[in-house]
Amino acid sequence: FSVCNMLAMPSTDGLFHRAIAQSGAAHHTFDPEEGSGIAAEFLGRLGNPSTDELLAMDVGALLEAQEQVAADRSHLPGRNQEPFYPVWGHEALPRAPRELIAEGAGADIAMLTGTNEDELALWGVTGTTAAEVDDMVGAITEDPSGMLATYRRRLDVADPGWLACAIGTDRVFRIPAVRLADARHANGADTWMYRFSWDSRAFDGQFGAAHALEIPFAFNTIDRPGVDVF
């Protein structure tokens, strides 16, 4: 997401010649109204401190408030995106990055983008219960039973954890990445896509091809200490 945001920023024009947006796209941002609302929720959790008071606060208190805001928003239909992402509507990012990219921002920069097969497995969703899957899907669509039926047919998988992983991976990573590539292609931008599907051996196979697993392969660091665990 950071790569796409930077490519959309007018001030970065000419600074990059190639880009890799791994497991990323241009949709994880908030408009000014949403950003102000999230900031108000966060500050409210802290007792609405002044700027000086906020700067002097214990980091633990800030992290706790952050987790509380994220938890509160996770139960709101259509608003369960992680709340702490960039806000557009200012000099650095005047409009939504996906709109700027659709209009040609960064089209002169060659890009490789894509996703992993099981992105959301990194967050432990493969252990999700059937009831939790129902709650998750109910928070993102008005037809949860229809969505679950579609994914069961498409994947031929009944396990609720892997269903949750597939749905979340498509929603958060894969579909936005495809839309990013389509937008760039419409502007004649050199764009390549990948789909990483190498399954990790970690956690008794519950990791699959999780988020970030492709990094050692992309940067040829698979021989680094600790990488062999996965």
Segments (PLM) and residue ranges:
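Short glycine-enriched nucleophile-adjacent loop
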Residues: 2-12
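Extracytoplasmic/periplasmic substrate-recognition and gating elements
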Residues: 149-161, 220-230
